């Protein structure tokens, strides 16, 4: 089975904890001396879920007790569509949002990721509801919005996994016949984020490039390949000489620039998606002109956990909040 659900009566003591504990027992993950489960049941598993109707939580087979989460939104359904007579339960929301057949198949194909931990363990990651909803809305805009309205700002609070949301968008594009010829440019402002983004997007079958210099970035933007480029924001304006000086002082976030070069028009295609991480930072507003000029017809989506008016002014209205 793709999904294993443990259902508990809501009136027993701690039904959610008992349901999760039983899921762990079925998988032989409780550390018992003798085998107590049937791990073969989970060989093809994508989601495990514990529910007692009023509370419902899910995780992957590698998740610990603390990793079980609520699916709090049934998007694209409205809550009133699920239960017209009142507020739907957590179980009803999760079933409509995750387990409706087309949603579940979409999640399995486009929203499951894997991460290698430093300990050597491979962790299976399942999406959170805001990641699924945000990626879904971005894809819908790419497909259906008029020119000039396809981009915008995605406001998800800190810690909600915006990097994974970007990866889910890319994977869904790759698996969509009408979107898999896009070029994707991912822009970050820290080296650790650039490395994280590169590792994360390697799970997608696009060719992945890191822009190592301003000239390298220009060449990657110019080419017509449907690929993914990961670039630091300073590549859109700072001279390499000044960047080298500051790298000796600081290897993390950017410092204030002293020299900004002007980019020419590099690619006029309208099949370019630019996704910008932490787009509320001042660097993006200062260098936005070069982004716009180098790819004048591209779709630009800003990801932020701290929205400010200037972000919306630069990148467009809210796609999801």
What is each model feature region?
Residues 39-40, 178, 220, 263-266, ...:
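A general structural signal for stabilizing positions within well-ordered secondary structure
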Residues 205-212, 275-281:
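Short, charged, low-hydrophobicity "junction" segments
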Residues 35-37, 212-217, 260-262, 285-289:
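Short beta-alpha junctions and helix-cap segments that line functional grooves
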Residues 16-19, 23-30, 61, 69, ...:
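Signature of the SF2 helicase/ATPase Hel1-core->accessory helical subdomain module
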Residues 1-188, 192-207, 224-227, 234, ...:
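ATP-dependent helicase/translocase motor core
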Residues 216-229, 266:
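Conserved motor-coupling elements within RecA-like helicase/translocase cores
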């Amino acid at each position: 089975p793709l999904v294993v659900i443990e259902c508990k009566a809501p009136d027993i003591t701690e039904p959610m904890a008992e349901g999760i504990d039983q899921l762990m027992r079925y998988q032989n993950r409780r550390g018992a001396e003798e085998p107590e489960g049937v791990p073969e049941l989970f060989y093809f598993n994508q989601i495990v879920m514990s529910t007692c109707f009023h509370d419902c939580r899910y995780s992957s087979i590698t998740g610990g007790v603390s990793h079980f989460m609520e699916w709090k939104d049934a998007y694209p359904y409205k809550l009133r569509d699920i239960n017209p007579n009142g507020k739907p339960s957590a179980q009803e929301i999760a079933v409509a949002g995750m387990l409706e057949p087309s949603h579940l198949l979409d999640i399995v194909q486009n929203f499951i990721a894997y991460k290698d931990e430093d300990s050597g363990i491979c962790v299976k990651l399942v999406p959170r509801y805001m990641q699924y909803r945000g990626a879904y809305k971005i894809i819908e805009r790419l497909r259906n919005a008029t020119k000039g309205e396809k981009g915008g700002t995605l406001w998800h609070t800190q810690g909600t996994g915006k990097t994974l949301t970007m990866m889910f968008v890319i994977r869904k594009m790759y698996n969509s016949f009408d979107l898999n010829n896009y070029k994707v440019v991912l822009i970050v402002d820290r080296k650790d984020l650039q490395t994280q983004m590169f590792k994360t997007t390697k799970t997608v079958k696009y060719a992945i490039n890191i822009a190592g210099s301003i000239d390298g970035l220009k060449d990657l933007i110019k080419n017509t390949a449907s690929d993914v480029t990961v670039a630091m924001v300073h590549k859109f304006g700072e001279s390499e000489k000044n960047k080298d000086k500051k790298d000796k002082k600081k290897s993390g976030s950017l410092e204030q620039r002293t020299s900004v070069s002007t980019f020419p028009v590099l690619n006029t295609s309208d099949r370019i998606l630019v996704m910008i991480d932490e787009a509320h930072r001042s660097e993006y507003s200062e260098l936005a002109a070069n982004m716009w000029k180098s790819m004048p017809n591209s779709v630009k989506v800003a990801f932020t956990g701290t929205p400010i008016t200037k972000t919306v002014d630069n990148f467009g209205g809210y796609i999801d909040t």
